[in-house]
């Protein structure tokens, strides 16, 4: 799927941006996507939108998938149990040509979030607090698994926010084990499995979680009791 999002002219959203480089990029996106049989979502298409939102809402992201995309916040898909990470243009080219990428194995990090969540505390507040505790480089070289009672209580949309911003503490990727909330969110969506295939998929997805005795290279527990809404700039 090729989605035009960042290079969308405002306020009239004309077909091509006025800026030369942006215009060239959009034209190649449309041409290459069409030539190779991708669904191209250009301005004016009712399904066009911010790439990560479109992918999730249309269930192009499913538990157990491995996904690479040209944006660091691709890690957001970990909220649905996918292993996802941002990659550069050259890596996208290689990915499309070979379906593979050569990467150094990431270290594993578990962040367990506990405590009592205040009524006005959002997922954004929680991840900002985590970034504050771990530091801007606290997760460098790691894939982070979020878990704990606070995480389990989050809605799917809130988990998406959490995983989206894991890159702000330098996580290469982030993930939350899929549960019934995720299955309910995906069921019936456009590209989700249907019928008997759905039932089999859910049974498989339930196995995609860390074992109780799993070992991590780094483990952190963060208590959010007393956390209040915050702002960043």
Regions found by a protein language model. Give the residues of each.
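Fe-S-dependent hydro-lyases/dehydratases of central metabolism
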Residues: 4-233
């Amino acid at each position: 799927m090729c989605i035009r999002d960042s290079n969308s002219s405002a306020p009239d959203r004309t077909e091509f941006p006025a800026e030369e480089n942006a215009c060239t990029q959009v034209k190649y996106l449309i041409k290459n996507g069409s030539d190779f049989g991708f669904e191209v979502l250009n301005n004016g298409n009712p399904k066009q939108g911010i790439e990560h939102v479109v992918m999730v809402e249309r269930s192009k992201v499913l538990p157990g998938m491995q996904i690479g995309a040209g944006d660091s916040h691709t890690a957001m898909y970990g909220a649905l149990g996918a292993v996802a990470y941002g990659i550069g243009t050259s890596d996208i080219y290689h990915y499309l040509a070979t379906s593979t990428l050569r990467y150094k194995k990431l270290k594993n990090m578990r962040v367990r979030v506990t405590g009592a969540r205040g009524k006005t505390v959002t997922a954004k507040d929680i991840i900002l607090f985590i970034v504050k505790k771990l530091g801007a480089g606290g997760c460098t070289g790691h894939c982070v698994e979020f878990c704990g009672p606070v995480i389990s209580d989050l809605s799917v949309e809130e988990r998406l926010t959490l995983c989206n911003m894991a890159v702000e503490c330098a996580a290469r990727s982030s993930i939350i084990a899929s549960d019934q909330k995720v299955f309910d969110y995906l069921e019936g969506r456009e590209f989700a499995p249907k019928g008997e295939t759905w039932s089999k998929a859910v049974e498989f997805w339930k196995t995609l979680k860390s074992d109780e005795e799993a070992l991590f290279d780094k483990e952190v527990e963060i208590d959010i009791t007393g956390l209040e809404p915050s702002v960043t700039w």
